[in-house]
């Protein structure tokens, strides 16, 4: 990747009249904004269908797209919906935040109407899509249909052990027949999602904009991935996890973080040549040009917590697959570019794995000015092969960080970067990242808008109020694009 910059902006954060960002007009408008601002990367969060809690990192599938992102106006233009069928529905009352409850109530009934009109009309195109995605689509569509049948509960709670444990091909076929309409619905929704996505991605490529996407290291227990291939995970003979994921206690959390995802059966995966991971990254390559590997340090060693624990305190470190896996992925996908999210617990082993892989790691400016210790996040310590962020989706926007950080940290930032009121605090921090030698610089959209309190994307460790922030219509102005472009060109990005 040549020297460039981009903006972190989740799809759900785009403005739209239907309560959540979609792949429609606002996505194309944002692409135009990026182009006008001289940005060559759009970083997104995972695009999969979300579960309770709405986290894109806990998805029902590592391959499927979120039906919430299917643009309804495009379906109206395509003759699949009538305007009257969507305009009077309650999509939420606050344009700044997503109301997932309201969207859940309204969205699928509308999409069912689109499927009823389009399933037969588009049968040849749908059949081709099914053939291209035969490795994951049948399992995903059946999984979602079964979830509906069993009250949207996770597969681990389904009463029928035959389908819960996938005891025979005959059982799967019986449920496909029983739930045929829902299987068709979830198949068709993926057809619509990918049709709209491919069109948007082609448009972005026409503007010389690359898509950076996240690959969460773990998948959700409540997912088609685990249900369909339980042998790839650390589960017992009743498909109950033996240990689950998390991170140990640290300076910020005395109990650590209990994520609860099933852990991989790395020995079995390696014996299979890491085929599961090859298929997964191949699926991600149909969405993204650059893949950020979340929690990269888990490839070196991961924190395993006994199943049933209520905190992560009693976990232990287990050696991960390391270069055995990373080498396979970079070898199989030479055209893909990867970013290693190497934040947290930078042990010598993690640093060595990053060096051996050749992948760029991450530098976060908000971590640079902690006056308690010298920091490798300070721009003067960067090498070219890294990605500099103002902050990630898990961090406060700069304007909020300024209010939350220790006064001595802010004083250090002011001195180090020569911050002044005329330029503005946010823009001075952005200048620090833009001017660094890091090959790629990424800022959150909130940082360019100088938004602080109530504008976080996510607060780790909390269960509500996350993944809701949205851009308002008219905030991404031509004047803002010109200012971003001026700084981008000044620093050769």
Regions found by a protein language model. Give the residues of each.
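Alpha-amylase-like alpha-glycosidases and glucanotransferases acting on alpha-linked glucans and related
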Residues: 10, 54-194, 219-442, 446-453, ...
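Surface-exposed amphipathic alpha-helices with a cationic face
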Residues: 35, 197-205, 330, 354-355
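Outer-envelope exported proteins of Gram-negative bacteria
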Residues: 45, 210-212, 216, 290, ...
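Conserved, well-ordered alpha-helix/loop/beta-strand core segments that scaffold catalytic motifs
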Residues: 186-219
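Short alpha-helical segments and helix-capping/turn motifs at coil-helix boundaries
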Residues: 25-32, 195-203, 277-279, 425-429
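C-terminal accessory segments of extracellular proteins
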Residues: 479-493
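Trp/Phe/Arg-rich N-terminal binding region typifying the photolyase-homology
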Residues: 1-80
């Amino acid at each position: 990747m040549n020297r460039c910059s981009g903006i972190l902006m989740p799809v759900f954060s785009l403005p739209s009249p239907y309560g959540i960002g979609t792949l429609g007009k606002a996505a194309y408008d944002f692409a135009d904004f990026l182009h006008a601002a001289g940005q060559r990367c759009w970083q997104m969060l995972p695009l999969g269908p979300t579960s309770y809690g709405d986290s894109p990192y806990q998805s029902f599938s590592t391959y499927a797209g979120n039906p919430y992102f299917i643009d309804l106006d495009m379906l109206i233009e395509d003759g699949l919906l009538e305007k009257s069928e969507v305009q009077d529905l309650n999509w939420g009352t606050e344009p700044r935040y997503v109301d997932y409850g309201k969207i859940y109530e309204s969205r699928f009934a509308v999409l069912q109407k689109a499927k009823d009109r389009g399933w037969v009309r588009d049968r040849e195109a749908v059949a081709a899509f099914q053939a291209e995605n035969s490795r994951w689509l049948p399992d995903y569509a059946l999984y979602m249909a079964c979830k509906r049948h069993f009250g949207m509960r996770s597969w681990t709670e389904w009463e029928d052990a035959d389908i819960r444990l996938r005891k025979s091909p005959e059982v799967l076929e019986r449920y496909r027949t029983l739930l045929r309409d829902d299987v068709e619905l979830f198949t068709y929704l993926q057809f619509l999602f990918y049709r709209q996505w491919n069109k948007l991605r082609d448009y972005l490529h026409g503007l010389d904009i690359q898509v950076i996407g996240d690959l969460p290291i773990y998948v959700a227990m409540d997912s088609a991935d685990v249900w369909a291939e339980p042998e790839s995970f650390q589960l017992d003979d009743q498909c109950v996890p033996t240990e689950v994921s998390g991170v140990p206690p640290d300076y910020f959390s005395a109990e650590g973080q209990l994520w609860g995802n099933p852990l991989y059966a790395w020995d079995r995966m390696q014996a299979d040549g890491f085929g599961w991971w090859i298929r997964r990254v191949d699926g991600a390559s149909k969405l993204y040009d650059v893949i950020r590997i979340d929690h990269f340090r888990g490839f070196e060693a991961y924190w395993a917590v006994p199943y049933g624990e209520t905190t992560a305190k009693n976990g232990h470190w287990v050696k991960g697959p390391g270069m055995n896996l990373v080498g396979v992925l970079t070898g199989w996908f030479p055209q893909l570019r990867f970013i290693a999210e190497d934040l947290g617990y930078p042990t010598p082993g993690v640093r060595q794995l990053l060096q051996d892989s050749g992948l760029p790691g991450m530098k976060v400016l908000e971590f640079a000015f902690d006056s308690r210790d010298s920091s490798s996040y300070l721009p003067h310590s960067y090498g070219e092969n890294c990605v500099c962020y103002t902050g990630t989706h898990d961090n406060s926007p700069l304007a909020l960080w300024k209010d939350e950080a220790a006064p001595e940290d802010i004083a250090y930032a002011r001195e180090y970067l020569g911050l002044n009121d005329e330029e503005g605090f946010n823009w001075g921090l952005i200048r620090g990242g833009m001017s660094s030698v890091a090959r790629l610089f990424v800022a959150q959209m909130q940082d360019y808008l100088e938004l602080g309190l109530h504008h976080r994307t996510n607060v780790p460790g909390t269960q509500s109020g996350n993944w809701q922030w949205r851009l308002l219509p008219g905030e991404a102005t031509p004047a803002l694009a010109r200012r971003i472009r001026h700084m981008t060109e000044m620093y050769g990005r």
